[in-house]
Amino acid sequence: MNTKNFTPQESRTNAQQVRQQNQQSAQGTSSGFATEFASETNAQQVRQQNQQSAQANRMSGATAGGFNTEFASETNVQQVRQQNQQSEAKKRNNQQ
């Protein structure tokens, strides 16, 4: 087993280096995540996509948003009316 005693200058941890790294880390902590997030988000591209989406919604006649448009596009109104009429007819027949 190696039991060599280290002098302060030979210590395994370089205190000055640790202080410097901590300082650099602290400086980056306040804005590091925000900077990374901003660098991965192309604001111009997002604006362009939002504009295209808004134009598409205006062209399709959407009033309140995408969900209403999607719901309406997947609902066959004529089929629903027909089913409602059949249901009402069955109710009338059952009441007689």
Curated annotation (Swiss-Prot):
Entries under Pfam families matching the protein: SASP_gamma
Keywords per UniProt: Repeat, Sporulation
Function: SASP are proteins degraded in the first minutes of spore germination and provide amino acids for both new protein synthesis and metabolism. These proteins may be involved in dormant spore's high resistance to UV light.
Compositionally biased spans, kind Low complexity: 16-27, 42-57, 76-86
Residues marked Cleavage (site): E36, F37, E70, F71
Residue ranges, compositional bias (Polar residues): 1-15, 28-41
Organism: Laceyella sacchari
Any single biological process term in GO: sporulation resulting in formation of a cellular spore
Family as reported in the entry's similarity comment: Belongs to the gamma-type SASP family.
Highest taxon listed in the record's lineage: Bacteria
Region (Disordered), start-end ranges: 1-96
Disulphide-bonded residues: none
Protein name: Small, acid-soluble spore protein gamma-type
Sequence repeats: 28-52, 61-87
InterPro entries attached to this UniProt entry: Spore_gamma
